A protein has these predicted regions:
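Hydrophobic alpha-helical connector segments
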Residues: 59, 73-105, 155-162, 203-204
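Amphipathic alpha-helical packing segments from all-alpha helical-bundle domains
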Residues: 119-145, 157, 187, 191
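Helix-turn-helix
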Residues: 2, 13, 17, 21-55, ...
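Hydrophobic alpha-helical segments that form the core
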Residues: 91, 105-111, 115, 153-172, ...
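Amphipathic C-terminal alpha-helical segment
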Residues: 95-99, 142, 162-180, 192-202
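N-terminal intrinsically disordered/low-complexity leader segments
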Residues: 1-9, 199-211
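Short, structured helix-loop boundary elements
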Residues: 11-12, 32, 54, 58, ...
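Short, basic, alpha-helical segments at the C-terminal edge of helix-turn-helix-like DNA-binding modules
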Residues: 62-68
Length: 211
């Protein structure tokens, strides 16, 4: 007796293909036809595995986060707050522009919701970005506690500054900015760091790019 329809596709590969569609077209712009064609499955299989288009997008975000975990771990492990900032912005600039054909330019967290009208999707993406900002804020709080950052520094504002700069890099990459352009912008943004926190210039410390 058959107990259920066997899954005849690789879930991870299907998610990677769906990720590219959402990345290029945004949540709202990605039709079910586009998604199922890219994933190599039919609509019943999509619904059976993910429940809905929104469920698929959530699964894609989880997979994207898995890719980013190594990158964020390396960023946060940098020995000083200045090097954390350096590793984060230069890493983002490299990731969103020099994809080697693996991904579209830009960032799924930004591009995925830019053209969407479904209010739940931008909120979902905002929560994911807030998690990254919280990681940076916590790291800077630790730096202030250890004396690496002055007591008068504002960890929340520093984390927010990096996130705003990173989001701008993502948008510019999607608009066609080159890797050189983005690294120059990152360098200018980082040149403000010493004045913001009262420390020396950040040393060069680049985290490994997320795959």
């Amino acid at each position: 007796m058959r107990t259920g329809r066997p899954r005849c596709f690789c879930k991870d590969e299907a998610l990677d293909k769906a990720m590219t569609v959402f990345w290029r077209q945004g949540y709202e712009g990605a039709s079910l036809s586009d998604l199922t064609k890219a994933m190599g499955i039919n609509p019943p299989s999509l619904y059976a595995c993910f429940g809905s288009k929104e469920g698929l997008f959530k699964a894609v975000l989880e997979r994207y986060d898995q890719r980013r975990e190594i990158f964020m771990g390396q960023v946060l492990a940098a020995p000083t707050a200045a090097e954390v900032a350096q590793a984060y912005l230069t890493g983002v600039a490299s990731f969103v522009s020099d994809t080697g054909g693996r991904n579209p330019p830009g960032c799924l967290m930004v591009q995925g919701g830019l053209s969407g009208s479904d209010k739940d999707i931008p909120q979902m993406l905002a929560r994911h970005r807030a998690e990254k900002e919280a990681m940076l804020r916590t790291r800077f709080e630790q730096a202030r506690k250890s004396g690496d950052l002055p007591k008068a520094s504002d960890p929340a504002a520093l984390a927010r500054y990096l996130m705003v700069m990173a989001n701008g890099l993502c948008v510019q990459a999607a608009a066609g900015a080159t890797a050189k352009d983005l690294q120059e912008v990152a360098a200018i943004a980082l040149s403000n760091w010493p004045a913001m926190v009262g420390t020396g210039q950040p040393k060069k410390s680049r985290a490994k790019e997320p795959a």
